[in-house]
């Protein structure tokens, strides 16, 4: 289980091209614009301007997803959170939005719609919550 990181991007919402490029960076690690551009153009059915990749990398940096380092004359972008951390942050935010509804009828309707596998997952989550509570009580 990946713990919730202390650092979070400033803006979680990403467009389709931003998401695609972020996944490329998670796969490759530290990248240049050329690395990303070449990866996208490896698909013969794709067209994308080099400057568009630069713009998206800059936007991902402004949103807090990437850091940019200059080495010599080249700029390298690297992720500030791992893919697993991003998934944990996303799940945490979705759970908080769900709980913010604060309407027992909505929560009950959700619980009624769960299948057996989902119920087992919720039971496992409940057990982890209980274990975390016991740990806090010991402190």
Question: What are the functions of these language-model segments?
Answer:
Residues 1-11, 90-93:
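Short, Lys/Arg-enriched N-terminal segment that forms or immediately precedes the first helix
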Residues 31-40:
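Short acidic, hydrophobic short linear motifs in intrinsically disordered regions
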Residues 19-23:
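Pre-recognition alpha-helix immediately N-terminal to the DNA-recognition helix
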Residues 39-48:
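Short helix-coil junctions and helix-kink-helix linkers
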Residues 71-90:
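Short, cationic-aromatic polyanion-contact patches
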């Amino acid at each position: 289980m990946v713990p919730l990181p202390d650092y979070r991007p400033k803006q979680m919402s990403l467009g389709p091209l931003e998401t695609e490029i972020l996944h490329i960076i998670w796969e490759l690690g530290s990248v240049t614009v050329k690395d990303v551009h070449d990866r996208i153009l490896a698909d013969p059915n794709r067209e994308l301007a080099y400057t568009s990749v630069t713009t998206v990398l800059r936007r991902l940096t402004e949103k807090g997803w990437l850091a940019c380092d200059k080495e010599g004359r080249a700029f390298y972008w690297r992720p500030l959170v791992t893919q697993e951390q991003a998934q944990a942050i996303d799940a945490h935010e979705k759970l908080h939005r769900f709980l913010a509804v604060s309407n027992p009828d909505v929560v009950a309707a959700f619980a009624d719609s769960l299948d057996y596998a989902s119920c087992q997952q919720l039971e496992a989550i409940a057990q982890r919550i209980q274990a975390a509570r016991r740990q806090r009580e010991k402190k």
